[in-house]
Amino acid sequence: GVGFPEKGTPQGGIISPLLSNIVLNELDWWVVSQWEEMPTRKNYVHRIYANDTPDKSCTIWVLRNKTNLKECYVVRYADDFKIFCKKRSDAVKMFEATKKWLMDRLNLQVSPEKSKIVNLKRHYSEFLGFKMKVRKKGKCKNGNPKYVIKACVKDKALIKIRKKAKDLIGSLRQTYDKHMEYRLIQKYNAYLIGVHNYYCIATYVNLDF
C-alpha cells in the first residue's frame, strides 16, 4: 500500500532545504545577534563599500577589545551548520546555549552523533563534502601566529567519487557502439566537470585526486 508520513520530510526531497531555511533562518539571526550584530552605544561604521556592505572593522575591534562577548560566527546550509569560536571555553558555552535555544525556541534537537566540539588546530571537521582544519602560516602584525584554512575533499566523498569515475570508465570500455561510446564520454566528462566545479574551492584539492 501507499503510506503517507505525518512527520518529517522525505530523504533528499526538494522541499527539505526550503523548510530548513525557513525555520533555521531564525537561528542565523540569533547567533549573529550574540556577536556581529550586538547593539553598541555608538555607531562605529564609518564607510559603506560600493556593494552597500558596511565596513564593520571598527565595530569588530570594539567588540573584541572592549567587551566580554564570545566571538562566534555561523555558517549554515539547509539543516547543516557550523558555529566557529576562537576559544574552546567559548565553544562549550555556545554549544550548550545553541542546543537550549533550538529546543526552547524551535522545539528541535541536535543530533548527538553529528554534533560535537572540534579543535581545528588538531583535527578535521567535515562540512558539505569537505574536511577542514587550520594551519599556521606566518605571523600577524602583533606577532601572534596567523592561521589559514586547509580544506580537502572528505574521505567518504573521495571514495564515492573514485568509485563513480571507475564505474563510468568500466562502462565505456565495455561498449563497442560508437553512439553509446560518445554518450558515455559526455557523461564521464560532465561528471568530472561537476566534481571539479564543486570542489575547486578546496585549498588542497590538487592533492586529493
Go through the PLM ranges and name each one.
Residues G1-F209:
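Non-catalytic terminal/accessory segments
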